[in-house]
UniProtKB/Swiss-Prot annotation:
Enzyme class, UniProt record, top EC level: hydrolase
Stored Pfam families: FBPase, FBPase_C
Record protein name field: Fructose-1,6-bisphosphatase class 1
Family as reported in the entry's similarity comment: Belongs to the FBPase class 1 family.
Signal peptide residues on this chain, from the entry's feature table: none
Residues the entry annotates as binding Mg(2+) 2: D83, D86, E226
Main location group: cytoplasm
Localization terms from the record: Cytoplasm
Assembly with partners or alone: Homotetramer.
Binding site for substrate: D86, G87, S88, S89, Y189, K220
Record text on cofactor binding: Binds 2 magnesium ions per subunit.
């Protein structure tokens, strides 16, 4: 698996370099779920596909920007699912964005998830790699990823990052969010899931939520590329995840590679509070 991780590092570095002088315009294409693709979405996907295709340990890749699974080496063991550029719609305002990767063994399923990674393209290039414990790495002047620290969640945080159009929230979710603000939680929501999860992780706690809404009853975020890898990282850091019913997002199973789900990531206190609010 280390070989797979090393090729992901190469792809992340190439994307970071390309971001220095990006074309932030839209292409004429849409991805599988109907999102109009930015030209840099397409370029990032091409970079990752090209790079991972050189890795003999990868059986197949699944991309948010591809309709179907792409088989690379049927004799290999690992399947890599990825969001090539999470938060790409924020490129024009120069917010931090990132790439998300999940490494599955043999079959894309939460129970087969063996490692997860995400990169942050911000003021500096950082990479979180998680097998047993999420570890933060930072690119140095020699183009090497240097270990910074292990990431751990506190039992309770102060950050509230909540997505979905507010007028379409269910009443129970609106009440839950209000209760957090009544406790003094701070709103920290950028519109890039990877950036918001990263802030919660590095600050030690809080909650990220993207609930079921009237206009998206099955949620909006994609299980295999976004939800599962970030849930894996949060839980390995000591946090909790749920869809509002289950006690872990990693309990969920889906047949379709572009399946979506409501999702909540956070410290133990916030997730326990949410489950109570959702199931009273």
């Amino acid at each position: 698996m280390q070989e797979v991780i090393s090729y992901i590092q190469k792809a992340v570095l190439e994307i970071s370099n390309a971001l220095k002088f990006p074309d932030t315009g839209y292409s004429q294409n849409q991805n599988f779920t109907g999102d109009t693709q930015l030209k840099f979405d397409v370029l990032s996907d091409e970079i990752i596909t090209k790079t991972l295709s050189q890795c003999s340990s990868i059986k197949a890749i699944i991309s948010e920007e591809k309709d179907e699974i792409l088989t690379l080496n049927e004799k290999a063991n690992f399947i890599v699912a990825y969001d090539p550029l999470d938060g790409s719609s924020l490129m024009d305002v120069n917010f931090a964005i990132g790439s998300i990767f999940a490494i599955y063994e043999e079959k894309a399923s939460a129970k087969n998830l063996r490692a997860a990674l995400y990169s942050m393209y911000g003021a500096r290039l950082e990479l979180v790699i998680c097998k047993d414990q999420p570890k933060l790495y930072r690119l140095n002047a020699n183009n090497e990823f240097i270990f910074i620290k292990d990431l751990k969640m506190n039992e309770k945080g102060k950050i509230n990052a909540t997505g979905g159009t507010q007028k379409f929230w269910e009443e129970k979710h609106a009440k839950f969010i209000k209760s957090l603000f009544d406790e003094g939680y701070r709103l920290r929501y950028s519109g890039a899931m990877v950036s918001d999860i990263n802030q919660i992780l590095l600050k030690g706690g809080g909650i990220f939520s993207y609930p079921a809404t009237q206009d998206a009853p099955n949620g909006k975020l994609r299980a295999f590329f976004e939800v599962f890898p970030l849930a894996f990282i949060i839980e390995k850091a000591g946090g909790k995840t749920t869809n509002g019913k289950n006690h872990s997002l990693l309990e969920l199973e889906f047949d379709k590679i572009h399946a979506t789900t409501p999702c909540f990531f956070g410290s133990e206190y916030e997730i326990s509070k949410l489950l109570k609010a959702y199931n009273e």
